[in-house]
């Protein structure tokens, strides 16, 4: 089994604590949390080992046929809020990210707590999640280059 500190270091470089807000019927917003790591297909073994350490999630194959020079990829993803709250967050609180994923993880935890309290189901809660995004922009220097490192897709 992989050393937990190795997993955290790997995630600091390759992982993503994603928060997405999608518009669904009747202009209601839906908030989702996902923990993801995407690698080239030949690195699938490391994703399987991380999956064992965390004890949750799925691994998917991705084909990028439209990009001729791209190789197939694999993605490890945890999308279950229960697994995120009971496995992913406790793991990374015990072995916290130290580099560019630190702020992303902190924000991820705040939004997970809001979801646990059902705040994401209210207009005020959605507005608070958007304002957290703006606050994160002010911490760019503690992150990486020009990217907030949080997926904020409005679908």
Which residues are covered by each model-predicted region?
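Sequence-level preference for short, compositionally simple segments enriched
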Residues: 1-155
């Amino acid at each position: 089994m992989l050393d937990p500190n190795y997993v955290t270091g790997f995630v600091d470089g390759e992982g993503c604590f994603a928060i997405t807000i999608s518009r669904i019927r009747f202009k209601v917003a839906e908030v989702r949390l996902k923990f993801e790591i995407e690698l080239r297909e030949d690195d699938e073994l490391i994703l399987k080992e991380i999956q064992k350490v965390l004890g949750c999630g799925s691994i998917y194959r991705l084909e990028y046929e439209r990009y001729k020079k791209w190789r197939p990829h694999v993605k490890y993803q945890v999308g279950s809020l229960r697994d995120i709250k009971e496995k992913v967050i406790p793991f990374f609180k015990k072995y916290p990210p130290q580099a560019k994923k630190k702020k992303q993880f902190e924000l991820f935890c705040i939004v997970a707590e809001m979801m646990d309290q059902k705040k994401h189901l209210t207009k005020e809660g959605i507005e608070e999640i958007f304002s957290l995004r703006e606050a994160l922009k002010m911490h760019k220097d503690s992150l990486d280059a020009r990217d907030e490192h949080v997926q904020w897709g409005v679908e």
